[in-house]
């Protein structure tokens, strides 16, 4: 059992999605960036490769006293706009999602965190590195809000978002999502095979 799963030499950052029904407003993820850190006192070489084919960016000076902030951009442009990290909720099985995300490689173990702001809210997701590789996964989520309590002015139930983001690390890999009978939800989730 590995107890330090967040530190790794390789991190796979899959695409994320915006909330369904939030094309405008304060829930759009802006100020998106990767935050890289390490316990190493020596300089670590890190390469960040966008999965859309853009040129990689290499840093030679990551250390415990010098974390790196890699700016991704904003999804706000008079409404939701996809970035290299966030894809539209209606394109999670399309070209946007296939070309989004990042591969982060370092010559020494590092931490990689996704951070973003959305209006008065903020979010962060921590990569699990090589410890997250595998072929079988389970996920559980809590329900968000109540459709019976929602009102017209602030329909939290329709804008809350729980999702799973999966990324194949080898070409021509088939990713299948099997939903058990116990699943509870308002929206049908589709299986995407690439």
Residue locations for each model-derived region?
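Bacterial N-terminal signal peptides
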Residues: 1-2
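Intrinsically disordered, low-complexity linker/terminal regions across diverse proteins
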Residues: 5-194
């Amino acid at each position: 059992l590995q107890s330090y799963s967040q530190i790794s030499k390789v991190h796979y950052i899959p695409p994320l999605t915006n909330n369904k029904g939030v094309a405008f407003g304060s829930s759009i993820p802006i100020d998106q960036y990767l935050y890289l850190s390490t316990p190493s006192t020596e300089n670590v070489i890190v390469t960040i490769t966008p999965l859309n084919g853009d040129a990689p960016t290499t840093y030679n000076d990551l250390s415990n006293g010098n974390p790196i902030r890699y700016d991704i951009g904003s999804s706000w442009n008079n409404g939701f706009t996809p970035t290299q990290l966030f894809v539209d909720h209606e394109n999670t099985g399309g070209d946007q999602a296939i070309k989004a995300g990042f591969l982060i490689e370092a010559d020494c173990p590092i931490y990689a965190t996704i951070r973003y702001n959305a209006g008065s809210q903020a979010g962060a997701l921590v990569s699990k590195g090589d410890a997250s590789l595998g072929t079988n996964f389970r996920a559980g989520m809590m329900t968000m809000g109540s459709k019976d309590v929602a009102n017209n002015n602030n329909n939290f139930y329709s804008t809350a978002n729980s999702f799973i983001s999966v990324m194949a690390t080898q070409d021509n890999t088939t990713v299948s999502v099997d939903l058990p009978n116990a699943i509870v939800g308002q929206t049908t989730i589709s299986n995407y095979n690439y």
